[in-house]
């Protein structure tokens, strides 16, 4: 019975637990996934904390037995097994804990389902056998309950064992690999269980929040691991090994330094004693031997620091200098480094209360090295290096060559370099000009000039003009200037005339350097022959030069080149100086003129002057000329049309005989100049005359060509311009032209003056009217109101706007006059709409077209404004009954007018009553013009026949028609008002109101258009 009671209690407990689980499941359905996870974790933590001890002691013996069977199990793993659940619950992440719990629950539920299925199958089998008795049923129930309880307990025990084994195996893997073989069976069971769990339960996908939390945890773990990196030292490198690799110090020095460092780092610093011998110090390095350092000792209580040795201050300099100067520096054993005395002084001066540190000044190994005398070999080596830097060639013995410096080769090299530089500059300039489209090669330019004779003639004329200008600016000797001209050729005219007066230094130098230097040189003179002059009309005179063997020619060419380079910058010299270089000036001697002539290129060929050309001696007669010439020294060269690097031809004239012969007397200089002048006359005049004749022939040919072209052009247009000029003389043609041209006007001077006076008078009248109108507008306030919208700003278009405004006013007046006609009923109908529109929209250009608008006395008070026209009148005897009657009649008109008519009579009701009571304000009655087809003659007469008993007399009033845009307030009318025959109405301003005062005097009624000029105040 007791067992039955226990079974019943257990069943009741299970039922209650099932109900609680059902309720919990219902609550879990309503909860969010996050709250479910929190609840599960809280329940698991509570169970683990409460049952930790009982679960640990439940199967202690079995776990201990299993642990003994395992090999190489450490004590730390045993301790971990007792607290595995706590460790897992506290240190695992939330994701791992939830997954583990879900797996456990899934495993339990699957086991329970299997047990229930087995029981049902057994019951089904028992039922199939037959229906047992009641006692058998009770016994069967008890047995089933016991079996279920035992199975449950066994399952729980097995789960606990599995957890313990899993934790043990996970930790034992890192300690021992043999433990894995012992737990193969347990792992196999675990894998089978996990397979069952996964097959029975479907894994739910993690939510976004769970994934986000998982990523955060992983990021936190990675940050923590990154903050604590693991430092691994692969290999330690000592200072000695480092210096050995770079080969900086010897092994002995490194050993001594290592020992000194050990002593410095030791706890007991060395002490200094005066009685002991001085330690030996290596003079080259300044390092104290280790044995001597060990002997030093210092008291334990002293705070004195170790002496800072020169080695500590030296950063590798001592060893560097010692290795470089080992061969030159001699070691001296007598000099030693007194380390003990320095340390002793530091100890004596030390004070117990304060710490004083004295640092020895920095010294280097150079202070300890004595300067040794340089040997002759070293001295000779230094001199050799200096000579090598100066680019002085040395022989094998180290001595320079006998010919240290050759002036001829030096000058030749200098000239070559200058020629190359000039050539490069010229090429660069040619490329720039080609890129701009200005430069044309010589061959191309010649072809174009041959094809275009007009261009060629123009160039020839330009040359002639240049020559004439140069001849006019020459010196006082007229005969010489008339005969001598610039050497030029006619077969290759340049595209620019200025190029004929320039010297191409680069071509001269390049071709001068091409001469053979070893050839024996002779004195040369340029000789012109008649055959050379007359042989080729278009060819240039080939100058022949013979070489001289004077050794002083290098000095002359060097001096001339220096002068060329110094004077090349002066570009502002006039062109007249160009002709002084050709012998035109009297002060140029024979040799200078010859040198300049040889350096001056012709139009087609350039005659070469050798760089070794020497100056002819003074008093050199023409009889000593050598007709034998060396033709090999002349080399023709084509001259380009554009010369980039050009120097003024006046530069060679600086080589004057006075500068070259400073030691000579004045008489010799004058005599030499006379001879040179005589030679230049006989030498250059023939050439110049020949060139002058050829230039005249070219100019004559060009003029003939131009005349032929002009005749051809006249023939093309023959017969078009009337009679030909062949039958008329020059005088007849001039008379005819004079008759065609009339320089004087046919109008007489009096007529012109009268016309000018008339125009002037008109202009004066117009200006006077404008000024008067402006003054009137200023006095009446019209100018202020006119510029009201422009904020009192002056504008050029004010007058134009004002004229447009007056035009609109006239247009409105015309429309009102048309509406007053009684025959407007004829114009009713759709057929007349176009006509009415044209009448209404037509513009009135001037008031001359409105003469028919002139009104009588009845039209007094009609005005115009920018918002429309207004009809102003006043009645002193108008009572309220007449006013009401008139309002009723007007209301009938407005009611029949349609939606376009707006009744504003009632807006003015209060103002009209006020004016009728006071009898002081003018009354304004607005009637809109949109009802023109409804206003008939009878209605207008009915409305207009308003009588005035007092002052106005028996008088008929027209219908006051006012613009629809007029404001309902009272208008201020400052224009000229029409007056009746009995009374003259004038305006006076009294306290802001307008009074109408009758006058006994009568005046002629003004015309309507005249009154429009006085309308200046329009709101």
UniProtKB/Swiss-Prot annotation:
The modification Phosphothreonine is found at residue 645. Interacts with cds1. Pfam families: MRC1 (PF09444). This is Mediator of replication checkpoint protein 1. The keyword Kinase does not apply. Keywords: DNA replication, Nucleus, Phosphoprotein. Residues 487-503, 590-607, 630-658 have a biased composition (Polar residues). Component of the replisome and is required for rad3-dependent activation of the checkpoint kinase cds1 in response to replication fork arrest. Phosphorylation allows it to mediate the activation of cds1. GO terms for molecular function: 3'-flap-structured DNA binding; anaphase-promoting complex binding; bubble DNA binding; D-loop DNA binding; double-stranded DNA binding; signaling adaptor activity; Y-form DNA binding. Residues 1-33, 105-143, 166-202, 261-290, 443-683, 965-1019 are annotated as: Disordered. GO terms for cellular component: chromatin; nucleus; replication fork protection complex. It comes from the Eukaryota. The gene is mrc1. The lineage of its organism: Eukaryota, Fungi, Dikarya, Ascomycota, Taphrinomycotina. Changing residue 614 to A: Severe hydroxyurea (HU) sensitivity. One of its GO terms (biological process) is replication fork arrest at mating type locus. Residues 17-30, 177-191, 476-486 have a biased composition (Acidic residues). The modification Phosphoserine is found at residue 604. Changing residue 637 to A: Hydroxyurea (HU) sensitivity.
């Amino acid at each position: 019975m007791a067992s039955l009671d226990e079974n019943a209690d257990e069943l009741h407990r299970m039922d209650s637990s099932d109900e609680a689980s059902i309720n919990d499941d219902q609550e879990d359905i309503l909860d969010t996934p996050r709250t479910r996870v929190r609840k599960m974790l809280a329940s698991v933590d509570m169970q683990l904390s409460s049952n930790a001890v009982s679960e640990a002691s439940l199967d202690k013996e079995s776990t201990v037995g299993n642990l003994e069977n395992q090999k190489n199990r450490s004590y730390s793993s045993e301790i971990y097994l007792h607290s595995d659940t706590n460790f897992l619950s506290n240190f695992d992440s939330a994701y791992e804990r939830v997954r583990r719990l879900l797996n456990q629950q899934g495993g339990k539920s699957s086991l329970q389902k299997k047990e229930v299925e087995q029981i049902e199958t057994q019951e089904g089998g028992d039922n199939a056998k037959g229906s047992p008795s009641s006692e058998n049923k009770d016994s069967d129930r008890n047995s089933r309950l016991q079996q279920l309880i035992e199975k449950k307990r066994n399952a729980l025990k097995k789960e606990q064992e599995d957890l313990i084994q899993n934790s043990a195996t996970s930790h034992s893997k890192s300690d021992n690999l043999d433990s894995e073989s012992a737990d193969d069976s347990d792992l196999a069971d675990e894998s089978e269980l996990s397979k069952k769990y996964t097959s029975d339960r479907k894994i739910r996908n993690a939510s976004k929040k769970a994934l986000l939390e998982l990523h955060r945890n992983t990021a936190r773990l990675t940050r923590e691991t990154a903050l604590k990196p693991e430092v691994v030292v692969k290999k330690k490198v000592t200072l000695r090994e480092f210096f050995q690799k770079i080969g900086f110090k010897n092994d002995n020095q490194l050993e001594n330094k290592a020992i000194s460092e050990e002593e410095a780092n030791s706890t007991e610093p060395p002490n200094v004693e005066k009685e002991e011998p001085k330690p030996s110090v290596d003079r080259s390095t300044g390092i104290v031997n280790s044995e001597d350092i060990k002997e030093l000792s210092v008291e334990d209580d002293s705070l004195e620091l170790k002496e800072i040795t020169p080695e500590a201050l030296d950063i590798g300099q001592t060893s560097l200098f010692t290795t470089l100067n080992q061969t030159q520096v001699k070691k001296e054993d007598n000099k030693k480094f007194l380390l003990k005395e320095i340390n002793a002084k530091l100890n004596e001066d030390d004070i117990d209360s304060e710490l004083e540190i004295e640092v020895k000044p920095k010294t280097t190994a150079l202070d300890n090295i004595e300067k040794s005398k340089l040997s002759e070999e070293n001295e000779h080596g230094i001199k050799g290096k200096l000579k090598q830097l100066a680019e002085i060639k040395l022989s094998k013995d180290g001595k320079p060559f006998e010919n240290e410096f050759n002036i001829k080769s030096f000058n030749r090299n200098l000239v070559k370099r200058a020629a190359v530089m000039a050539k490069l500059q010229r090429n660069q300039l040619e490329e720039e000009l080609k890129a701009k489209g200005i430069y044309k090669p010589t061959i191309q330019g010649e072809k174009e000039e041959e094809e275009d004779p007009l261009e060629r003639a123009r160039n020839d004329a330009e040359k002639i003009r240049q020559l004439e200008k140069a001849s006019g600016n020459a010196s006082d000797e007229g005969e010489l200037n008339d005969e001598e001209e610039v050497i030029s050729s006619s077969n290759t005219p340049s595209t620019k005339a200025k190029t004929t007066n320039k010297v191409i230094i680069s071509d001269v130098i390049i071709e001068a350097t091409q001469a053979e230097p070893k050839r024996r040189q002779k004195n040369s003179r340029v000789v012109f022959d008649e055959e050379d002059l007359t042989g080729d009309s278009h060819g240039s005179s080939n100058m022949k030069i013979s070489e001289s063997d004077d050794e002083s020619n290098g000095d002359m060419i060097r001096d001339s080149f220096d002068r060329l380079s110094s004077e090349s910058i002066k570009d502002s010299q006039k062109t007249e100086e160009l002709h002084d270089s050709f012998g035109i000036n009297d002060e140029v001697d024979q040799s200078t003129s010859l040198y300049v002539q040889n350096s001056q290129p012709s139009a087609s060929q350039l005659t070469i002057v050798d760089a070794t050309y020497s100056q002819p001696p003074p008093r050199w007669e023409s009889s000593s000329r050598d007709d034998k010439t060396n033709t090999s020294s002349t080399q023709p060269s084509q001259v380009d049309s554009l010369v980039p690097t050009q120097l003024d031809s006046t530069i060679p004239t600086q080589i004057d005989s006075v500068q070259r012969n400073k030691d000579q007397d004045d008489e010799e200089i004058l005599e030499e100049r006379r001879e040179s002048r005589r030679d230049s006359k006989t030498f250059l005049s023939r050439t110049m005359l020949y060139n002058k004749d050829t230039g005249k022939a070219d100019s004559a040919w060009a003029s003939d060509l131009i005349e032929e072209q002009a005749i051809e052009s006249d023939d093309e247009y023959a017969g078009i311009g009337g009679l030909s000029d062949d039958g008329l003389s020059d005088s007849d043609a001039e008379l005819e032209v004079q008759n065609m041209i009339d320089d004087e006007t046919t109008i007489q001077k009096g007529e012109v003056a009268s016309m000018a006076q008339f125009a002037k008078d008109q202009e004066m009248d117009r200006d006077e009217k404008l000024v008067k109108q402006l003054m009137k507008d200023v006095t009446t306030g019209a100018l202020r109101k006119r510029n009201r919208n422009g904020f009192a700003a002056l504008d050029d278009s004010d007058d134009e706007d004002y004229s447009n405004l007056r035009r609109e006013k006239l247009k409105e007046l015309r429309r009102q006059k048309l509406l007053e006609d009684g025959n407007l009923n004829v114009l009713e109908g759709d057929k007349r709409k176009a006509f009415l529109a044209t009448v209404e929209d037509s513009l009135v250009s001037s008031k001359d077209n409105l003469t028919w608008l002139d009104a009588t006395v009845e039209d007094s008070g009609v005005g115009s404004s920018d918002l429309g026209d207004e009809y102003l009148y006043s009645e002193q005897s108008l009572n309220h009954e007449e006013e009401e009657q008139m309002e009723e009649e007007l209301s009938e008109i407005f009611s029949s007018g349609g939606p376009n008519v707006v009744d504003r009579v009632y807006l003015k009701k209060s103002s009209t009553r006020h004016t009728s009571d006071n009898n002081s304000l003018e009354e304004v009655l607005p009637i809109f013009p949109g009802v023109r087809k409804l206003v008939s003659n009878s209605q207008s007469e009915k409305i207009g026949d308003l009588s005035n008993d007092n002052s106005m007399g028996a008088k008929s009033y027209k219908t006051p028609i006012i613009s629809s845009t007029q404001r309902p307030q009272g208008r201020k009318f400052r224009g000229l008002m029409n007056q009746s025959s009995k009374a003259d109405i004038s305006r006076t301003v009294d306290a802001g109101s307008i009074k109408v005062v009758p006058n006994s005097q009568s005046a002629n009624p003004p015309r309507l258009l005249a009154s429009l000029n006085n309308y200046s105040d329009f709101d």
